[in-house]
Amino acid sequence: MRFFLAITALVAAVTAAPSADVAAVNQMAAMTLAEADASCGNGASLYCCDKSKQGGDTGSPGQAGGVGLLGAIVGVNGLLQGLLGQCSKININAIGAAGVLNQECTARAACCQNTPSVAHHGLVNIALPCIPINSLVG
């Protein structure tokens, strides 16, 4: 009886799990550089982030850090830096705004703040300088 209940709960959990949003995936595939830059908004620029990227204009566009509880996770050498890796700015003026985003950035495109990100002293401090663009589209 318990085995049947466990299997039923597992099946219910799997069927209730959200599926990939096909419209958002298609929108990301056809997104131009101008649309991606507009998604970033004011005060942020479009970057291409890749863990294995070396050389060129790489580095953190802003300092992510804090002295609070999550400072070690989000800090300059923290866990979240590994999610995006090294980032280089996509110069839209040099490339042209009509270019397709996934042709110019085969890794992960992100919107990064133009000013350093600072988390002030407190219990939970999160200062994220970059946000993946696929989390802004949808």
Curated annotation (Swiss-Prot):
Which pairs of positions does the record mark as disulfide bonds?
Answer: 40-111, 48-105, 49-87, 112-130
- Keywords attached to this entry: Cell wall, Conidiation, Disulfide bond, Secreted, Signal, Sporulation
Q: Which GO terms describe its molecular function?
A: structural constituent of cell wall
| GO CC annotation terms, alphabetical | extracellular region; fungal-type cell wall
Q: What induces it?
A: Highly expressed during the whole fruiting body development with a 3.66-fold increase at the ST (sclerotium) stage compared with the HY (hypha) stage. Expression responds positively to light irradiation.
Q: Which Pfam families match?
A: Hydrophobin (PF01185)
Annotated signal peptide: 1-16
Q: Where in the cell is it found?
A: Secreted; Secreted, Cell wall
Q: How does it assemble?
A: Self-assembles to form functional amyloid fibrils called rodlets. Self-assembly into fibrillar rodlets occurs spontaneously at hydrophobic:hydrophilic interfaces and the rodlets further associate laterally to form amphipathic monolayers.
Query: What does the UniProt function comment say about this protein?
Result: Aerial growth, conidiation, and dispersal of filamentous fungi in the environment rely upon a capability of their secreting small amphipathic proteins called hydrophobins (HPBs) with low sequence identity. Class I can self-assemble into an outermost layer of rodlet bundles on aerial cell surfaces, conferring cellular hydrophobicity that supports fungal growth, development and dispersal; whereas Class II form highly ordered films at water-air interfaces through intermolecular interactions but contribute nothing to the rodlet structure.
Family designation: Belongs to the fungal hydrophobin family.
The protein here is known as: Class I hydrophobin 3
